[in-house]
Amino acid sequence: MRNETIIVNGKKLKWLFVERGFKIPSFNYTTTTEKVPGRPGTIKKARDLEGYEFDVPLIVRNDYLAGRKDHDDILNEVVKFFDYDEPVKLQFSNKKWYWNAYFDGPFEIVSNNDGFITFNVQVILTDPYKYAIDGNQNTAISDAVSVVNAGTAETPIIVEARALQNSNYYMISKGDEDYFMIGDDDLDKPLKDYSPLILEDEARSFSGWNKQNTIDFTDNQTGGKVGGSFIVSDSKQSFYLNNDSVSGNGWNGAMYKRSFSKQAQDFTTTVKFGINQKNKGAVRFAQYIYDSDNRVIASIGYTNPNAKQAIGTIIVTLFDQSGNQQTIYKYKNNPSLYKLDSFVVYIRLTRKDDVFTVKSWKYKEFPYPLRKKAFDEHERQFVDGGNFYQRPVVALSLYSAKNGSNNVMPLYIFGTYTRELLPRPINARDMIIKKGDLITIDMATKNVLVNEESFLSEKTFGSNYFNVDKGHTELVINPPGIFDTTVKWQDRFL
């Protein structure tokens, strides 16, 4: 029989094995009973599935075949292997399931360590379930989707729904009682799209964009000289700066401009771009908004000015009619991001009457079990008390720049989306879900995203997150004919 290795967060040490005879704990139910005088036997008060705390006995093979190591080398490798502040995947190499586990010490490793060495690692399971390594998914047909959970316990699901048309709500239900919904389905309320798109572009081609060779305003925060060019990525999913198209000292870059489908007074605009921090370098990015006189009225930018560090800052500014620039938002990335190789940045600027609202957040798909997560969210408002920034808006431009001969941090523009905001009557229903939107509902983490933005504020009162039972479950989607829905799940075991 082959020796069984231990796999932690997808990694293993080739010389570390599980000692034979280890008994895997399962089915950790405890029943609490109470004796009632005058009645035979007892009555059940509670039955609970408890967590686990147990030791896993491990063996270090320390010989010429595995490569000899001294005590400190072994200890340091083992500490790195198990040192996590969050629960991570714990798997045994001969099994087709994993736990989400914490690890505790102490590690007691003998100083004289030739041959085979034994020690224990303490495993803490606050989540008592085992999860199948291979996931499952099924696509809805005629607004119904079947889920077959081959495990021995109910399991949470992930719902992904692509809107084929605008909609005021999305609901997925299990039977007559369990359902989850975002939006408002009250038919007595008037329904209209109060935030129609006036520009949507996902950086797939330069069609509709005009390359700019001159610039008539000064942005000292995230701007610079123009004249360079963008490249469309091979995947046709982003624009990025052609570094060979610009030269000279200081900030030099490329700018492309595009008009809205109509002029707008109140508006909201969101820009989305990716940062590759693994390659250290300096970079600037900005999206500029233009008024009806073709003057810049706002900039939405990002800068990493130090070519040897990864400390980015989001900066949003407004321009008056004379071109004077005022910063209304400045937010440095949370230090927890400094060690990430890459992530996606979203910045949204909204003008409603005399109030400007800026919201930024980051997004990433984290490793297995794969979870989509929005994080480092931050929001701030600015009141235009003097009505200096109230001109109608008609166009925007995208700008990305490098600094002289310094290394460039790769920045990929993924898309820009601008909507006009129309007056909305009290209690009216809005088309909060637009054609093409991707809804993600994670029942395990209680996380709701629409286009990678947290959407928990739109969760309908009375709806709840739910699990699917072991065996077969039928789920129903409403409204009918509007969404292309896929449900993902992992079989779960006691």
PLM feature spans:
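Short tryptophan-centered beta-strand motifs in secreted/extracellular beta-sheet-rich domains
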Residues: 269-271, 338-370
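Secretory/extracellular carbohydrate-interaction modules
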Residues: 207-324
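Extracellular/virion structural assembly segments
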Residues: 1-199, 276-283, 289-295, 417-494
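Noncatalytic modules at the cell exterior or secretory-pathway interfaces
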Residues: 84-85, 159, 342-350, 383-401, ...
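Extracellular carbohydrate-recognition regions
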Residues: 150-152, 177-234, 410, 420
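Flexible glycan-contacting loops in extracellular carbohydrate-active proteins
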Residues: 369-412
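Extracellular/lumenal carbohydrate-interaction signature centered on repeated Trp-anchored short motifs
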Residues: 257-269, 335-343, 466-468
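Short, aromatic/His-centered strand-loop micro-motif at the edge of beta-sheets
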Residues: 315-346
